[in-house]
Amino acid sequence: MIVLGIESSCDETGVGVVDLDEQGNLTILADAVASSMQDHARFGGVVPEIASRAHLESMVPVMREALHRAGIDKPDAVAATVGPGLAGALLVGASAAKAYAAAWDVPFYAVNHLGGHVAVANLDGEPLPHSVALLVSGGHTQLLEVEAVGLPMKELGSTLDDAAGEAYDKVSRLLGLGYPGGPVIDKLARRGDPQAIAFPRGLMKKSDSRHDFSFSGLKTAVARYVEAAERAGEVISVEDVCASFQEAVCDVLTFKAVRACQDVGAKVLLLGGGVAANSRLRELAQERCDAAGIELRVPSFKLCTDNGVMIAALAAQRIHEGAGGSALTVGTDPSLAVETPQVF
């Protein structure tokens, strides 16, 4: 069965196509993505109106590219992200998916963006044991308890202020490195000393929430360090600042993720979201999972960021479990809860 997925929750227009066999195994047939990231760069972050307009311009070309790569005229089912995400951006993708589903006379599946990140980390088709998912991006930093792909997830904790990816972007702007901050900070951090500056780790005291995150204090600490150096006329090592900041972020993320696994008895940690492409996060997560006897599953770098494959993968899993399609009247929900894998 051929399933096509459309992703448009933020600044990427993604169309992915997967082939679902009778055993539930998935084969990726196409992964086409158009990003409007450069359109947002001069604003230092994603502008919702610009993102929506970019989706409108990119949807048809990206769809054509995906169908061409997959070598098909039409799929057997169409899925789309209906939340969470930017309201206007979600509307573009969901509306397109409904139109294509109606024109092709195939079922439509309205699915959860966050569930897609979990599904794409388990593309091998093997049954997913009781797991914890750490989803880290510019808009989300969450720990989720996962019983199986396509089933409702339970939120164990989330950020109380800035998402991890958002903190990267803000620190990058502070250092004059531009937007987005994740890739450039990761690159510079490799040349710096992660122990050079003792930046704080938020919510790491015994009295703090075990599974929640906070990165606003870290962001402020970086700003104060830079301001103090400028007042003193000192030249800072941008590489050391990046390395020390990144170490603080990854230390907290991986420590709490492994602890969450231990707290709920999960033997697998799933890592997803754009920040999951970060080299230090992947490295430290692997080290700590190995030490704790936990299996780490991480998607390829390309599938960490938003894409249509993850939406197709989640819908395919729902189809394999016998779920019917969603109504074409289903609306989008920018604040869709993780407990809702599919909207009917």
Curated annotation (Swiss-Prot):
It comes from the Bacteria. It is found in: Cytoplasm. It holds the Pfam family TsaD. Its main location: cytoplasm. One of its GO terms (cellular component) is cytoplasm. Substrate binds at L135, V136, S137, G138, G139, D169, G182, D186, N278. It is an enzyme of class 2 (transferase). The keyword Endoplasmic reticulum does not apply. Its cofactor is Fe(2+). GO terms for biological process: tRNA threonylcarbamoyladenosine modification. The keyword Amino-acid biosynthesis does not apply. Binds 1 Fe(2+) ion per subunit. It catalyses: L-threonylcarbamoyladenylate + adenosine(37) in tRNA = N(6)-L-threonylcarbamoyladenosine(37) in tRNA + AMP + H(+). Required for the formation of a threonylcarbamoyl group on adenosine at position 37 (t(6)A37) in tRNAs that read codons beginning with adenine. Is involved in the transfer of the threonylcarbamoyl moiety of threonylcarbamoyl-AMP (TC-AMP) to the N6 group of A37, together with TsaE and TsaB. TsaD likely plays a direct catalytic role in this reaction. NCBIfam families: gcp_kae1, T6A_TsaD_YgjD. Belongs to the KAE1 / TsaD family. This is tRNA N6-adenosine threonylcarbamoyltransferase. The gene is tsaD.
